[in-house]
């Protein structure tokens, strides 16, 4: 009777036994090969850089503490340097100052006009507002404008908004959507957010200082525009300019 002996594997001597108990984390910067492979497989699924991942990159020692205290918590990996080729808007600085909205806003109606006439969208009046949102959303968050914020850039910005987008439009409905309707909405939103208090039981007109002299003409222009644009279409351009000017 032959007894089969068990194959006993030789024990390997490891100078660092802790490495066998705790294998390297796939997102550990101390292991470049595993680290980059993990990023290539995971950065498309997690395109946002979390604050914890940023802290781990700055302080590698904090990684071991995080694993020891909360091993089940998943941390977002650090984005690679070539993320700009994947996300075209990743280079945009979202933290921006409102002082640059004035000079940046003049580029929005100009770009809308070029897009409107180059793509021949005259048969679709509703596309004016859509194209304006697309262009202005990109322009207002761009801080690369060489212009400086000064009062002289406010007037061209205000006048260009109603005139450039509707200068060569032939349809009366298109002019209404591009000039009169936006100016009416801007004035009403300004009055409701700044000058009025819409709390149940406490509805009131809150402005009591000198700015009330501006709020009253804004309200009159908004109410008067509803009747004038129906009887006298030639006054549409004037109302579209006066109302946003008072709001600014």
Curated annotation (Swiss-Prot):
Q: Which domain of life is it from?
A: Eukaryota
Query: Segment Disordered: which positions?
Result: 1-34, 51-81
Compositionally biased tracts (Polar residues):
10-19, 61-76
Which Pfam families did the record assign?
A: DUF2463
Instruction: Give the similarity note.
Output: Belongs to the UPF0328 family.
Its name, as the record gives it, is UPF0328 protein ECU06_0030/ECU06_1690/ECU11_0020
Query: What organism is this sequence from?
Result: Encephalitozoon cuniculi (strain GB-M1)
């Amino acid at each position: 009777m032959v007894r089969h002996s068990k194959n006993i594997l030789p024990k390997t001597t490891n100078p660092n036994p802790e490495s066998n108990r705790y294998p390297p984390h796939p997102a550990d910067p101390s292991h470049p090969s595993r680290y980059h492979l993990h990023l290539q497989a995971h950065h498309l699924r997690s395109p946002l850089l979390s604050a914890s991942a940023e802290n781990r990159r700055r302080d590698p020692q904090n990684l071991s503490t995080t694993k020891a205290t909360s091993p089940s918590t998943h941390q977002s990996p650090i984005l690679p340097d070539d993320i700009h080729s994947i996300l075209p808007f990743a280079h945009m600085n979202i933290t921006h100052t409102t002082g640059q909205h004035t000079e940046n806003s003049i580029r929005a109606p100009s770009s809308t006009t070029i897009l409107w006439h180059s793509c021949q969208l005259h048969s679709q009046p509703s596309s004016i507002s859509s194209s304006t949102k697309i262009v202005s959303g990109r322009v207002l968050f761009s801080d690369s404008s060489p212009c400086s914020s000064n009062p002289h850039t406010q007037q061209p910005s205000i006048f260009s908004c109603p005139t450039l987008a509707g200068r060569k439009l032939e349809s009366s409905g298109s002019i209404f959507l591009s000039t009169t309707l936006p100016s009416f909405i801007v004035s009403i939103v300004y009055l409701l957010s700044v000058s009025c208090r819409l709390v149940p039981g406490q509805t009131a007109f809150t402005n009591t200082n000198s700015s009330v002299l501006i709020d009253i003409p804004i309200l009159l222009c908004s109410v008067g525009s509803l009747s004038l644009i129906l009887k006298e279409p030639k006054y549409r351009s004037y109302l579209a300019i006066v109302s946003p000017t008072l709001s600014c």
